[in-house]
Structures are given as structure tokens and as C-alpha cells.
């Protein structure tokens, strides 16, 4: 009886899971060639995938959840997916270069999603890009609500001006990363001090910063640099994104599970420098910490001890290491100043030698990871080609040996023919002089094979 109840419960759970998958998939449309003509009437969030792509298969359940969530909240954005290998011409038209590629299509515009492949991040991207490019903030209450909701956002304060046109141009390019708002001077919080109008501000890290055209240069470049919080928990994706800012990244490489003084101290030092020395270093440095050294080891092609501090130049793969432990904030500030004045020598880079080293390192890492994860698969992948090459080499060697033997047989046969001709000539000369006497026959030389038989 107990077994029957367990079996019934198991079947019920399986049925629920299957139904849930069917329901989720029902809100994601499979797109075909007709999508090109019909898409302009709606806003579409599309996953361009390939059936054989492993990352695409990992994204599929998340994508189904995105479709279900967007439908449940009544979003005007439709969610779909397209096999980019079957409809390659359409995928090429939208600029698909790899798989999976997520794009939001709004009218004639196509926006690439480059963030983490999580449900919440994808949905936030869809809401941000599908809405107005510049969102108005009509009241202080709305302003405060946006401050609580977004960790980083930009605000234009003022009326029509050339600065506003630049702001709109920057927003059209960078809306895929952050939010852009506009407000009147009366709506801005009282603690904000503006020396001149119009102005562009960024609100983050529980404070604000004002754009200065003379000090900060191009507005789009400034927004691209300031769209990150001053201190971040880093991962590989964030480091890749920071490569566009031109900033150096000061990292405390720690083990977050380790609560010893060495690990917590380095993290606190970096946080304090990021907070207290922002005016000195924020134009050139981004601060943060990373849990574990696996990614950093791959990036540096070296084994870093944990905990440690490393400064990365993600634009050219250079890095800076200190030959001693950083014990306090003063040590870290001195390290940064030495990097800025060129006292500390950069390591790594993207030279030809480093690129060759990278190829060898990546190949070695791939082989090691395969053997660690699946030794049998590694033996098959690398043993089979080696076996084929060995057989080919053996075949070439034996073919040369047989050729030599055939050549030797040819030389032996040639000499036998010459001997036979000489014997026949001697017979003809002896027959007239002997007058019919019997001449003993000369035994012909034996073939090489006959000699072997004897």
C-alpha cells in the first residue's frame, strides 16, 4: 500500500512538472520566416539559438520562465525564439554572430542583450529598453521611488539645449545598460547643488555626481564610465564589461567562505579606498573583490595565492602585482600611485609572444579539464587520433620495406635474364664445332624463392 502511494505521488509530481513545462513553453512563440514581415506591429524579445548549442540548451528553461513572467504581468513585449540555423538569412539580417543571441526588436531598432542570463536580469532589460528612452520624473515622490528601485541612474535637469541632444544620443546607445530620466529643478532633491543649468547627474552609492564637460570630456564616455557602482562584487562578465570603460580594476581576490582576518582585511581596505579616495582615483580605477582565483588564474595564466590584491587592465590584458602584502589603506594608496606614475612594471599584455603563450595555456587547460571531468572521454578523444596516426606511420614504414624487396627481386630477375642469354650464346658457338656431340646442360641459376625452399 505504501509503495502504491509513493508511486502515485511520483506520477503526480511528474505530471505537474510536465504541465508546468508545457505552460511555460506556451508563452514563447516559435518564429519562422513570416516573422520578418509581421514583427513591426509589436515589440519582440527574441532568443536566436542553434539546436546543437550547449549554452542555448541551458538558456531554454530560463527563457520559458521569462515568457511566463512577461505574460503574467501583462507586458506588451512578446517573447519568441528562432532557430538561427534554419532561418540563417533572417538571423544575419539582425546581426546574429553567435549563439545564443538575445535581442529586443522595437520598430526598426534592434538592441543586443549583454547581461547575465538570468530571468530577472533579462526581464529588467526588456522593461528598460521597451519603454521610453528618456523617462520623465514629474514629482519628488517619483524621484525617491526611482532612487530606491535603481542602484545607478542618470538624470537630465533643464530645458531644451545642445546638452539635452547629446544626452538623448547617449541614451539611445547606452539604454541597454542603464536608465535615463529627465526632471525639472524643482523635482530634484534639496541636497543636490547645481552650479549651472542644464546639467546631467548620476545617482549612485548613496550620493550624486555632476557631469562637467571640461573635466569629463565626451558625455557618452562619461556615462559609460559612471554606469557602474564604485565598488562591485566582480565576476568574469563584469570584468569584460569594464574593458569598455578604459579603467584599471583594483581587485581583492579572496575566499568569501573564509572569515579569517587576512581575507576580510583586504576586502575592507579596497572598500575604504573606493569610498574615501573617490575624488582622486575614480576617473582611472574601478574597485571590487572576486570570490576565488579560478577566473583570475586563467586571465593571468598564473597561479595567484589567496588572499591577494591585483590590478587589471582589461583593455589590453596587462596586470600589476605587488611584491609584498598590503597591510593597510596607506599601502594600497601607495600601490595605486606607483601604478599611475609608472613605478610598478606591468606584466602580461597582448603582444604576439603573449598571444602564443595564451594559445598554449588554453590548449593545456582544456586537456587537463577534460581528463579531470571525464578520464575515459579524454582517453577516447586523444587516444583515438594518436592510434590512427600510429597506424598511418606503421603503414608508411612497411610500404617502404616492401618497395625495397620488390626492387631487389627486379635486380635479381634482371641478372638471371643476362645469365640465360650468355648460356644460349655459348650453346650456339659449341654446336658447330662438336658435330652433334651432346653438351651437358648447364643448370640455370635458382630463383631466390627456390633457394629459400632448398
UniProtKB/Swiss-Prot annotation:
Induction, as annotated: Not up-regulated by unfolded protein response (UPR).
Domain Thioredoxin intervals: 25-128
Disulfide bonds: 53-56
Modification note: N-glycosylated.
Task performed by this protein: Probable disulfide isomerase, which participates in the folding of proteins containing disulfide bonds. May act as a dithiol oxidase. Acts as a regulator of endoplasmic reticulum-mitochondria contact sites via its ability to regulate redox signals.
Transmembrane spans: 376-396
Positions of the UniProt region annotated as Disordered: 412-454
Active site: 53 (nucleophile), 56 (nucleophile)
Natural source organism: Homo sapiens (Human)
The name this protein goes by in its record: Protein disulfide-isomerase TMX3
Amino acid at each position: 500500500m505504501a509503495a502504491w502511494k509513493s508511486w502515485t505521488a511520483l506520477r503526480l509530481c511528474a505530471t505537474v512538472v510536465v504541465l508546468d513545462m508545457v505552460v511555460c513553453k506556451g508563452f514563447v512563440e516559435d518564429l519562422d520566416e513570416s516573422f520578418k514581415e509581421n514583427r513591426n506591429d509589436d515589440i519582440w524579445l527574441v532568443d536566436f539559438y542553434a539546436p546543437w548549442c550547449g549554452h542555448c540548451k541551458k538558456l531554454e528553461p530560463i527563457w520559458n520562465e521569462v515568457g511566463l513572467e512577461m505574460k503574467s504581468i501583462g507586458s506588451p513585449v512578446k517573447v519568441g525564439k528562432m532557430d538561427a540555423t534554419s532561418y540563417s538569412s533572417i538571423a544575419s539580417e539582425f546581426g546574429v554572430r553567435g549563439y545564443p543571441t538575445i535581442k529586443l526588436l522595437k520598430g526598426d531598432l534592434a538592441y543586443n542583450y549583454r547581461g547575465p542570463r538570468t530571468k530577472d536580469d533579462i526581464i529588467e532589460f526588456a522593461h528598460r529598453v521597451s519603454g521610453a528612452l528618456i523617462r520623465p520624473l514629474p514629482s519628488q515622490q517619483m524621484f525617491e521611488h526611482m532612487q530606491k528601485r535603481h542602484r545607478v541612474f542618470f538624470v537630465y535637469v533643464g530645458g531644451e539645449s545642445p546638452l539635452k541632444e547629446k544626452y538623448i544620443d547617449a541614451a539611445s546607445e547606452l539604454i541597454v545598460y542603464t536608465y535615463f530620466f529627465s526632471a525639472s529643478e524643482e523635482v530634484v532633491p534639496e541636497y543636490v547643488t547645481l552650479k549651472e543649468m542644464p546639467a546631467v547627474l548620476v545617482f549612485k552609492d548613496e550620493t550624486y555626481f555632476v557631469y562637467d564637460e571640461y573635466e569629463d570630456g565626451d558625455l557618452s564616455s562619461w556615462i559609460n564610465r559612471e554606469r557602474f557602482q564604485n565598488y562591485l562584487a566582480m565576476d568574469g562578465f563584469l570584468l569584460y564589461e569594464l574593458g569598455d570603460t578604459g579603467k584599471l580594476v583594483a581587485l581583492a581576490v579572496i575566499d568569501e567562505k573564509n572569515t579569517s582576518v587576512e581575507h576580510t582585511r583586504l576586502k575592507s581596505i579596497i572598500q575604504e579606498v573606493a569610498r574615501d579616495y573617490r575624488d582622486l582615483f575614480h576617473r582611472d580605477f574601478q574597485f571590487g573583490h572576486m570570490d576565488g582565483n579560478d577566473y583570475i588564474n586563467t586571465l593571468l595564466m598564473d597561479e595567484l595565492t589567496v588572499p591577494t590584491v591585483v590590478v587589471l587592465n582589461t583593455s589590453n590584458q596587462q596586470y600589476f602585482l605587488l611584491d609584498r602584502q598590503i597591510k593597510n589603506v596607506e599601502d594600497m594608496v601607495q600601490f595605486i600611485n606607483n601604478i599611475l606614475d609608472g613605478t610598478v612594471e606591468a606584466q602580461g599584455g597582448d603582444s604576439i609572444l603573449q598571444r602564443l603563450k595564451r594559445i598554449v595555456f588554453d590548449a593545456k587547460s582544456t586537456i587537463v579539464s577534460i581528463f579531470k571531468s571525464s578520464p575515459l572521454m579524454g582517453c577516447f578523444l586523444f587516444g583515438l587520433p594518436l592510434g590512427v596516426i600510429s597506424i598511418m606511420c606503421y603503414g608508411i614504414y612497411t610500404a617502404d620495406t616492401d618497395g625495397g624487396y620488390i626492387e631487389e627481386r627486379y635486380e635479381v630477375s634482371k641478372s638471371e635474364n643476362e645469365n640465360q642469354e650468355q648460356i644460349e650464346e655459348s650453346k650456339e658457338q659449341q654446336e658447330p664445332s662438336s658435330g652433334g656431340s651432346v653438351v651437358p646442360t648447364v643448370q640455370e641459376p635458382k630463383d631466390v624463392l627456390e633457394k629459400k625452399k632448398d
